[in-house]
From Swiss-Prot:
Its main location: cytoplasm. This is Probable archaeal histone 4. It comes from the Archaea. Residues 20-22, 54-57 are annotated as: Interaction with DNA. Gene3D superfamilies: Histone, subunit A. Homodimer or heterodimer with another histone. Dimers then assemble into higher oligomers, with the DNA wrapped around the protein core.
Length: 67
C-alpha cells in the first residue's frame, strides 16, 4: 500500500482523458509512481553524498532522472 494520497492520481488519469477511474487503478498508479520516485530519490541522495553534501539539490534530481 502506498503512503501517497490516491486522489491526485485519479485527477491525473482524468486529465489525460479517463472519464471514470476505479479506486484500484488510481492506487496501482500511485504505487508505481512511488516505486519510481523512490529509485530516483535514492540515486539523487547517492549523488549528493558523492559530492560530499548533505543537501539534495535540483541538479541531483535532474542527473538521477537521466540514469
Amino acid at each position: 500500500m502506498t503512503e501517497l494520497p490516491v486522489a491526485p492520481f485519479e485527477r491525473i488519469l482524468k486529465k489525460v482523458g479517463a472519464e471514470r477511474v476505479s479506486r484500484a487503478a488510481a492506487e496501482y498508479l500511485a504505487e508505481a509512481f512511488e516505486e519510481i520516485a523512490l529509485e530516483i530519490a535514492k540515486e539523487a541522495v547517492d549523488l549528493a553524498k558523492h559530492a560530499k553534501r548533505k543537501t539534495v539539490k535540483v541538479e541531483d534530481i535532474k542527473l538521477a532522472l537521466k540514469k
